[in-house]
Amino acid sequence: MIRAFFVTDLHGSISRYEKLFAAIRDEKPSVLFLGGDLLAHRLRPVLWGTGVITNFVSEYLQVRLKALRDLLKEAYPAIYVIMGNDDARSEETYFIDTDRQGLWSYIHEREVEYGGYTIYGYAYVPPTPFQIKDWERYDVSRYVDPGAIPPTEGFRTVESSDDVSQATIARDLDRLVRPGSLKHAVFLFHSPPYQTSLDRAALDGVTFDGVPLDVHVGSIAIKRFIEERQPYLTMHGHIHESSRIT
């Protein structure tokens, strides 16, 4: 039996990461999935030891993961990682560098094999009210919920190579996943599926220009994909309060 940990939305919290590393040392999972929104906010300094961290991946995560690998040796888990909508894509080069060092596998829009399963990673979320758009896509069409900012607006830390006015989560999933059975497929998403217990936001009674906001903010495309293709397992992050509300 594969012993797995799934953790998401740590947002650069040193205390939460240290709890995670302690749990890995104690319980020795075979595999760890990190579901995005892993970095500290760009404008918030992170203190560690006696100094301030200026690059969270290279100065903290790589250091702690190397120490963990040295300690656990053969018991060091396989680690699969995606970024999230609050992670600046300008930091992606450091995620790739950590992959090259063998500390984790960065799997956004990739498929990898592990223990008889095919693992897929996908970081994009539907449009949000937030300004950073590195990891946002139109969902199934160019419709945007009231109060949300389209992916064509806001700002990006890295120029997109896609036509963001036409790209959708639905098209991405069609391209990423080949036809056929997904009974041994595992998906690491940042976005939750729409209208489920995982995408319930604390928006009760909130309006925008007099229009009540939908309390469900997940992806229609991801929900349809799960219902139609029936993968073995999907993991999701993004909406912090959903577990408390539901």
Where are these regions (language model features)?
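Core catalytic region of metal-dependent phosphoesterases/phosphodiesterases
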Residues: 14-114
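Active-site-proximal loop/helix segment associated with metal-binding centers of metalloenzymes
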Residues: 117-214
